A protein has these predicted regions:
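Intrinsically disordered, low-complexity acidic Ser/Thr-rich regulatory segments
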Residues: 1-60, 122-125
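Forkhead-associated
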Residues: 37-114, 119
Length: 125
């Protein structure tokens, strides 16, 4: 079943084109809530940090986000999200997690930000 929306926000044609062009082993996060709504973040390294710290790979600048909040880690071509001891927790599909392997369409909540996870298999050409 192709995914056509991110819950709060329908996917644009540009979003769908970007998802279709993803290389195997990479993924895309699309922000659906927060000051960066509509922003896209490419996951293309083995480890990607998320937090309020300016040195984070993905900077989410809000007091609800810890300086070092979470890490996206790739193992055998699949990404997991790992909470980095954050104060407010990391959630996948509204469940608080310490670590969780991600699937297409999963919604990751970090502070007040919501990010939806996609790989190239989310879209059927």
């Amino acid at each position: 079943v192709p995914i056509t929306s991110t819950g709060d926000r329908p996917l644009t044609k540009e979003d769908l084109d970007t998802i279709m062009r993803l290389s195997d082993g990479t993924a895309l996060l699309i922000s659906t809530r927060g000051a960066v709504s509509g922003s896209r973040y490419l996951l293309d390294e083995d480890e990607i940090t998320v937090g309020r710290d300016p040195r984070a790979d993905i900077l989410l600048d809000d007091s609800t986000v810890s300086r070092s909040h979470a890490v996206f880690r790739r193992v055998n071509g699949a990404y997991s999200v790992i909470d980095a001891g954050s104060l407010n927790g990391t959630y996948v599909n509204r469940q608080r997690v310490d670590q969780k392997q991600l699937n297409n369409g999963d919604e990751i909540m970090i502070g007040k930000f919501r990010l939806v996870y996609f790989t190239n298999s989310a879209v059927i050409a």
